[in-house]
Amino acid sequence: MKLSAFTLAFALILMMAIMYNMAEAAALADADADAEAIAGLKDWWNKHKDKIVKVVKEMGKAGINAAGK
């Protein structure tokens, strides 16, 4: 199954939003969990940011190319 760059970027952004909401819920429940959840989210972002930036750049190029046609 071949996924478009838009579909992949949308899925990644949705996953980040879900993780952010989980971190926020943990922060409300417990201050210690807040620091741990944010650290986990930062680790996840540092691990995946290159892929996300690449996909977003490809989406931008695809959008520019589509607009030019």
Curated annotation (Swiss-Prot):
List localization entries.
Secreted
Major site of localization recorded for this protein: secreted
* Tissue specificity of this protein: Expressed by the venom gland.
Q: Give the pro-peptide residues.
A: 26-39
**Leader sequence segment:** 1-25
Q: Keyword annotations for this protein?
A: Antimicrobial, Secreted, Signal
A GO cellular component term found in this entry reads: extracellular region
Main function: May have antimicrobial properties, like most ant linear peptides. In addition, when tested in vitro on the parasite Trypanosoma cruzi (responsible of the Chagas disease), is able to moderately reduce the number of the three forms (epimastigote, trypomastigote and amastigote) by inducing cell death through necrosis.
Q: What is this protein called?
A: M-poneratoxin-Dq4e
Its organism's taxonomic lineage begins at: Eukaryota, Metazoa, Ecdysozoa, Arthropoda, Hexapoda
